[in-house]
């Protein structure tokens, strides 16, 4: 039997939910992690300024002479918007439908958006810098570098800011990220020179603490109250749901509602890295 094709991407739905929550409660349209450097505590009211600092960190590392940028996985388009305000010519890659609509509303005619996967971008245009801001983890490393090299001008740059797995046994409750050692070895095959490398795990870990606090203080109580109400109103249906989806519910509780998705565990099992490469001419 053919495998049923899912028309709705769960990752994109998750990002859309996050965007709605961030915009309504925290007054931010960024979807990336916050950069909690010294003097900025990991508190809900500080997420928006921490995300702005993250964006400023990326901009501050754009090499002189760069004019044309391809933002891979542009999210809501907010960072691309800021880059155009700074005078850069920016195009975007956005594979999903939901976030692409947000980006198009914000960017208008400022940027061309390739509504496809990065590997499927078809264009004769060349860029000075290709940016992967928390999008690299969704693309195979070899495919990402192979495609990037085809789209870059001679002497162009690749900027990656994302987290990687450092736990070979995969004990971490936090998903996502390429295996760090595999990534380091894979990049050696390509004609690029490492210009700047920086570990920002400590600065970004506060984002995980905020997410965990929201989970434990809002989502978990809500989850329990919903089942409490269902058991009172629809006892037989609730028993059936718990029996039918026992393994899935246990997985959700174990992975997402255990309270183990903390900044400390993030730094223990993950490594959030910034890389800037220059293509060898």
Residue ranges, per PLM feature:
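A short SAM/SAH-binding and catalytic strip from SAM-dependent methyltransferases
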Residues: 129-141
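Substrate-binding/catalytic lobe of Class I Rossmann-like enzymes that use SAM or dcSAM, i.e.
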Residues: 171-262
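A short glycine-rich, Lys/Arg-flanked "PGG" loop and its adjoining helix->strand segment in the class I
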Residues: 143-157
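Conserved alpha-helix/loop element of class I SAM-dependent methyltransferases that forms part
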Residues: 48-65
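A short acidic, Gly/Pro-enriched loop at the edge of an enzyme's catalytic core
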Residues: 120-130
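N-terminal, positively charged/glycine-rich alpha-helical extensions of SAM-dependent methyltransferases
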Residues: 1-38
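Class I SAM-dependent methyltransferase SAM/SAH-binding core
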Residues: 70-120
């Amino acid at each position: 039997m053919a495998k049923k094709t899912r028309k709705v991407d769960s990752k994109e739905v998750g990002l859309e939910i996050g965007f709605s929550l961030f915009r309504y409660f925290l007054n931010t349209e960024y979807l990336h992690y916050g950069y909690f450097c010294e003097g900025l505590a990991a508190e809900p009211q500080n997420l928006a300024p921490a995300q702005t600092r993250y964006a400023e960190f990326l901009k501050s590392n754009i090499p002189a002479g760069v004019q044309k940028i391809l933002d891979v996985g542009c999210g809501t388009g907010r960072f691309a918007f800021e880059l155009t305000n700074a005078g850069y010519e920016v195009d975007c890659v956005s594979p999903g439908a939901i976030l692409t609509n947000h980006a198009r509303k914000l960017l208008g005619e400022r940027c061309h958006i390739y509504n496809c996967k990065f590997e499927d971008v078809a264009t004769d245009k060349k860029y000075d810098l290709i940016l992967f801001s928390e999008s690299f983890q969704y693309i195979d490393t070899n495919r990402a570098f192979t495609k990037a090299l085809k789209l870059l001008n001679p002497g162009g740059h690749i900027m990656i800011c994302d987290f990687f797995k450092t736990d070979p046994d995969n004990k971490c409750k936090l998903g996502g990220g390429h295996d760090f050692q595999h990534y380091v070895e894979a990049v050696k095959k390509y004609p690029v020179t490492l210009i700047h490398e920086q570990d920002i795990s400590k600065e970004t870990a506060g984002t995980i603490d905020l997410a965990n606090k929201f989970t434990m203080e809002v989502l978990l109580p809500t989850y329990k109250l919903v089942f409490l109400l269902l058991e009172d109103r629809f006892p037989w249906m609730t028993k059936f749901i718990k029996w039918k989806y026992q393994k899935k519910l246990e997985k959700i509780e174990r992975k997402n509602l255990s309270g183990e998705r903390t900044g400390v565990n993030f730094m223990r099992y993950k490594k959030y890295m910034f890389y800037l490469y220059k293509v060898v001419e």
